[in-house]
């Protein structure tokens, strides 16, 4: 933290002389604060203080003024320190915050795991014979396209319901208890999947399990963004993508084992379902002891608890730690107060579309996450099935899937390095551009029936997975946590994830029709379709997606308020803590309200 000793001394001076505003004349008490006329002309953000006698009690308004301006100075100091904090310093100062964020994000492993095994089941022989039908022409067993679509719709519908339930639950009990409740229900609903004897039971189980998965999707991102400083936010929000990949890799390994050892046994699909019981209990215990988000606590007016929560995320002890806590709480309060000045109501879903600023932020957040589906990533989730339909053997299809997820994990780690040199928009747009080219090549290879073209299309899909996890996938988790206002962050993320789910449903239906031999049977030629859709997503990103790298939440708020265009976000500099229009008269009964209003208006 920059110049902590100065802040400590400033607070001591304020305590010893509460009637004097730091750095101003001591002879009289200010009765109004206004900008100097020449300063206004010059455009300089300097506060000029006029003094005159006041008939009121000598200390009350001065004390309030000092407190308000000190809080704003503290908020600005915290914001500047956060923006300039190196990664090593952030890890040394906030190691506990990083650890708690990693713990909460680990819940996404279960969603990545289960959604991956569902797609892999369609290529598993025992699952095909148990729940599928035989193709009269080829003699092969296959799950019908209608059931594949139905199962996909069930878990995505469950996620949509779960996301909608997450909003009011967080408002009521907070992030921690909402996650614990979701983990409990996930463990309970897994029994339905384990004891399934029909596709109908699997559909019910998937729909019910989808509800806690929806909760995980929202809260892992919002919790990581609110508990960690700017220097760590990219790494810890994109860790959500790593958890997805860990779950998918785990699923690919289990499914390859099932394909080899349990090809003719019900354990081939029961064992993968049973392994979902491993994580809920230890994760629930860990989350119970985790600190609540200080942003949520401040919004609820529980400032002492917010300070305790922040202390649990910081290393060290003594006055410097307490100053860090005070600065951070003041910054959160100023940010939330500025947002509250825009509306007198508690944040609701309708507020996400209430005015031009929030409509823009909501639109960008929703379309940014929807881009994960329209770029063709849903095809990666059905990779084993895709490889098989492209002409690759069943065993090699499972092997390709394992390699694909390993490449994705390596790519996500590489994105952490790339984030030092490239912005969020740069990585997002680069990923879209590369995938557009590769999908067209895959489509072209699909026009040939040679063995080399089949292996080539499979290899290129692995390349798509690599660059998707280098650019688009991890960056989205960061962007969707930065675009919304803090007051509406949880609700905006819920709307965005539901947008993604709806778009994913449409994309999944299209993919299953494209790959199923009884429907369109496009095989690798489906790459042409996804190349076009990916290119359309790239055009949107160029026009509408701002660059937020290196910007704090307060700066992003100000940039949206000023209506800065997407491509000018990166170069535009703002100072959201400057007081440009302080009240001209603080001699009435509520000087605090007027000064807060003048600060909030900026």
UniProtKB/Swiss-Prot annotation:
One GO BP annotation of this record: maltose metabolic process
Upregulation: By maltose and maltotriose. Repressed by glucose.
Keyword Membrane set for record: yes
Primary location group: membrane
Family annotation (InterPro entries): MFS_dom (IPR020846), MFS_sugar_transport-like (IPR005828), MFS_Sugar_Transporters (IPR050360), MFS_trans_sf (IPR036259), Sugar/inositol_transpt (IPR003663), Sugar_transporter_CS (IPR005829)
Compartment(s) of residence: Cell membrane
Topological domain spans for side Extracellular: 128-142, 200, 256-270, 385-397, 448-459, 514-525
Name of the protein described by the UniProt record: Alpha-glucosides permease MPH3
Organism: Saccharomyces cerevisiae (strain Lalvin EC1118 / Prise de mousse) (Baker's yeast)
Gene that specifies this protein: MPH3
């Amino acid at each position: 933290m920059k110049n902590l000793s100065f802040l400590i001394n400033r607070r001591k001076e304020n305590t010893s002389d509460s009637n004097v505003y730091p750095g101003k004349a001591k002879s009289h008490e200010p009765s109004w604060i206004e900008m100097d006329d020449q300063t206004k002309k010059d455009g300089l953000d300097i506060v000029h203080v006029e003094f005159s006698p006041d008939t009121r009690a000598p200390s009350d308004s001065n004390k309030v003024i000092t407190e308000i301006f000190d809080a704003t100075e503290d908020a600005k100091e915290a914001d500047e320190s956060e923006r300039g904090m190196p990664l090593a310093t952030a890890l040394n100062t906030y190691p506990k915050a990083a650890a708690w964020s990693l713990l909460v994000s680990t819940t996404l492993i279960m969603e990545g795991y289960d959604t991956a095994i569902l797609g892999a089941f369609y290529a598993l022989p025992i699952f095909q014979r148990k729940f599928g039908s035989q193709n009269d022409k080829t003699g092969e067993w296959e799950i019908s396209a209608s059931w594949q679509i139905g199962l996909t719709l069930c878990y995505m519908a469950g996620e949509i319901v779960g996301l909608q339930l997450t909003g009011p639950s967080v408002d009521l009990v907070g992030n921690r208890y909402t996650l614990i409740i979701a983990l409990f229900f996930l463990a309970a609903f897994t029994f339905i999947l384990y004891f399934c004897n029909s596709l109908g039971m699997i559909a019910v189980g998937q729909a019910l399990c989808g509800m806690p998965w929806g909760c995980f999707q929202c809260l892992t991102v919002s919790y990581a963004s609110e508990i960690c400083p700017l220097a760590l936010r990219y790494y810890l929000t994109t860790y959500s993508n790593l958890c997805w990949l860990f779950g998918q890799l785990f699923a690919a390994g289990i499914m390859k084992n099932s394909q080899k050892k349990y090809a003719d046994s019900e354990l081939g699909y029961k064992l993968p379902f049973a392994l979902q019981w491993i994580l809920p209990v230890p994760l629930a215990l860990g989350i119970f002891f985790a600190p609540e988000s200080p942003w949520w606590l401040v919004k609820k007016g529980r400032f002492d608890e917010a300070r305790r929560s922040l202390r649990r995320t910081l290393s060290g002890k003594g006055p410097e730690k307490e100053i860090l806590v005070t600065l951070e709480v003041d910054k959160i309060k100023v940010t939330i107060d500025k947002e509250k000045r825009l509306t007198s109501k508690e944040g609701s879903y309708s507020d996400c579309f209430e005015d031009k600023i929030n409509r823009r932020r909501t639109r960008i957040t929703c379309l940014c996450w929807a881009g994960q589906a329209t770029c063709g990533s849903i095809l990666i989730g059905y990779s084993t099935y895709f490889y098989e339909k492209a002409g690759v053997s069943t065993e090699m299809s499972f092997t390709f899937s394992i390699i694909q997820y390993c490449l994705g994990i390596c790519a996500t780690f590489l994105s952490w390095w790339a984030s030092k040199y490239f912005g969020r928009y740069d990585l997002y747009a680069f990923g879209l551009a590369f995938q557009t080219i590769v999908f067209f090549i895959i489509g072209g290879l699909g026009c040939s029936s040679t063995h080399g073209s089949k292996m080539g299309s499979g290899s290129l899909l692995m390349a798509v997975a690599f660059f998707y996890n280098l650019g688009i996938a991890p960056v989205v988790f960061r962007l969707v946590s930065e675009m919304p206002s803090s007051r509406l962050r949880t609700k905006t993320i819920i709307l965005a994830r539901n947008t993604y789910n709806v778009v994913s449903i449409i994309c999944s239906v299209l993919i299953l029709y494209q790959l199923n031999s009884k429907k369109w049977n496009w095989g690798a030629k489906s790459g042409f379709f996804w190349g076009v859709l990916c290119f359309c997503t790239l055009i949107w990103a160029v026009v509408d997606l701002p660059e937020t790298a290196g910007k704090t939440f307060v700066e992003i708020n100000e940039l949206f308020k000023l209506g800065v265009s997407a491509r000018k976000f990166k170069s535009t500099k703002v100072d959201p803590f400057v007081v440009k229009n302080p009240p001209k008269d603080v001699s009435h009964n509520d000087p605090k309200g007027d000064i807060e209003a003048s600060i909030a208006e900026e």
